[in-house]
Amino acid sequence: MVQVVYPNMADLEIGNVKEVYNKILASLNEYYGKMFENLVFEMLKLKIIDFGQKSVAKWWHKGEEIDVLAYNNNKMIAFEVKWKDLSFKEAKGILRDLERKLDKVDFDGEKECYIIAKSIEGKEKLKALDLMDLEKLIIF
């Protein structure tokens, strides 16, 4: 509570409650995004999301980033993770960009790209998972 209220105390004291609320809401979505990416990473690591991977990692190179790579000796899958409701068009664009990034990763086997997001319009037509799919994997 202190981490949220104290930095905004001056604005709260003069009645700028709505502005503080919007500022906190924006930072919450950023926080949820980081936690969602961590969740996907752990679910892949523990093989709750199982693509036959032996290893899971993040990748960075010259300002480019791939949120999660899951791979074995023969196959590498790149995942872009978004805590956002995506339209079909947005998701396709993100997958295209992810394919471009994955081309830069030195790997001799098969490569694939997936997107995992809060929700994805038309996900059935894409290599995609959403929050509902992840929920089904953990509900017994």
From Swiss-Prot:
Pfam families: DUF234. InterPro entries: DUF234, Restrct_endonuc-II-like. It comes from the Archaea. This is Uncharacterized protein MJ0425. It comes from Methanocaldococcus jannaschii (strain ATCC 43067 / DSM 2661 / JAL-1 / JCM 10045 / NBRC 100440) (Methanococcus jannaschii).
